[in-house]
Amino acid sequence: MIPGEIKTDSGDRELNVGRPRIKIKVANAGDRPIQVGSHYHFYEVNNALKFDREATKGYRLDITSSTAIRFEPGQEREVTLIPYQGSRTVIGFQGKVQGVLS
């Protein structure tokens, strides 16, 4: 075994099993690509991304940890989001929440 190595069973893994999900259409109205990371509070992403922002409060992308989705200028796509778990405290990002989600 290599130090830090993690051995797992073979096969694919399903992420966030049993978690509620929402799908939302997102469009990049800006003139530059925008990349959003796996754990970024979607409600607080770049303002050039157009979507029903209020519906995404307390949600993040349903993608593998440490990965991201890139939105090219003019691109529209549907993304899947999952709610934050645990204490549901959101601090940082654009500073729009700064505390516990309701």
UniProtKB/Swiss-Prot annotation:
It is found in: Cytoplasm. It catalyses: urea + 2 H2O + H(+) = hydrogencarbonate + 2 NH4(+). Pfam families: Urease_beta (PF00699). It is an enzyme of class 3 (hydrolase). Pathway: Nitrogen metabolism; urea degradation; CO(2) and NH(3) from urea (urease route): step 1/1. CDD domains: Urease_beta. InterPro entries: Urease_beta-like, Urease_betasu_sf, Urease_subunit. GO terms for biological process: urea catabolic process. The keyword Hydrolase applies. The keyword Hydrolase applies. One of its GO terms (molecular function) is urease activity. Keywords: Cytoplasm, Hydrolase. Its EC number is 3.5.1.5. PANTHER family: UREASE. This is Urease subunit beta. It comes from Alteromonas mediterranea (strain DSM 17117 / CIP 110805 / LMG 28347 / Deep ecotype).
